[in-house]
Amino acid sequence: MKVALKIAYDGTKFHGFQRQPNVRTVEGEIIKALNNSGIMFNELKSASRTDKGVSALGNVVAITTEDERITNPMILNAKLKDVWVLSAVKVPSDFHPRFWARSKVYRYYLPSFDLDVEKVKECSKLFLGVHDFSAFSRVDGRETVRSIDRIEVLDLGPVLAIEVEAKSFLWEMVRRIVKTLELCGLGKLSSEEVRKMLRGKFEKSRKVPPAPAEGLLLVEVKYKGIEFPIHDKALEKFRKDMEKRFREKIARAYLLWDMTKI
C-alpha cells in the first residue's frame, strides 16, 4: 500500500528537508515519528527537498507501508514536532510525488519598505514563459531552461506576496527571482538588464544572490486526479499551533518596529 501525505512544516526549525547526519531535518523528523508510532515502512519519497529555512504548507511525501494507521493524520501528528500531516490518501503503487507533479506553487513574503511596487509587478512579467534561468539559480549541472506558468505580486501592505507556479524549479530559483524583483523595485536593476539575463547573457560576478530562505513557502504541489482532503482534527491542531507562533512573532516584530522610531 502506498499513501501520500500532505505535510506542512516550519522550515526555520530544520536544516532542510533531506535527511543528513547530526542535524535536524524534516525527513528525519517524519522517519522518527514513523518509528515511534511503530509503523513499518519500505520507502519514503518527497515532492520537494526544500532548503534549510524554507517552510511548506503543502509538500507531499509518499510512504509504502502495510499499516493502515498511516491513513489517519493524527497518528503521526501525535509524534511530530514542527511538522504537521494535514491529509493522507491512498495512491497507485507507482505514484512518485516529484515525477507525478503537474506543478508546484511557491510564495515568497518580501518586505515592501522603499520598494516601487509597480516596478516590481512590471519586472515580474518578464519571467513568464520559457527562459534560460542560469542567471537565477545555483547551477548544479542540470538543464537551466525552465518555464514559469504563473507569477503574481500581491500587495499586502508591509509585505509583498510573490507567488510563482511552474512544473519544475532549479536550485534557489524562486529566491533569486525574488531578489531580482526587489532590486528592480529599489531602482538598482533595470528591466533591460533582466531581459538580457533571461537570455543567458550575464557576467558571473553580477549574478543576483538569493533572497533569505526564511521568507519562502512551498504552498502546494498539484497532481492530476489526486486530491488531498484536509483532515478536520489535523487542521484544528495546525491552526492552533500556527496562531500561537504568530502571536509570539508579531509581538516581537512590533517591538523591533517601535525601536526604529527612536
From Swiss-Prot:
Enzyme Commission number: 5.4.99.12
GO BP annotations, alphabetical order: tRNA pseudouridine synthesis
Pfam families from the UniProt entry: PseudoU_synth_1
Keyword tRNA processing among UniProt keywords: yes
Coiled-coil ranges from the UniProt annotation: none
InterPro entries, A to Z: PsdUridine_synth_cat_dom_sf (IPR020103), PsdUridine_synth_TruA (IPR001406), PsdUridine_synth_TruA_a/b_dom (IPR020097), PsdUridine_synth_TruA_C (IPR020095), TruA/RsuA/RluB/E/F_N (IPR020094)
One Gene Ontology molecular-function label: RNA binding
Keyword flag Isomerase: yes
Catalytic reaction equation(s): uridine(38/39/40) in tRNA = pseudouridine(38/39/40) in tRNA
Sequence positions that bind substrate: 106
Active site, UniProt feature: 51
UniProtKB keywords: Isomerase, tRNA processing
HAMAP family: TruA
Function: Formation of pseudouridine at positions 38, 39 and 40 in the anticodon stem and loop of transfer RNAs.
Family, similarity comment: Belongs to the tRNA pseudouridine synthase TruA family.
Protein name per its UniProtKB record: tRNA pseudouridine synthase A
Lineage: Archaea, Methanobacteriati, Methanobacteriota, Thermococci, Thermococcales
Gene transcribed to yield this protein: truA
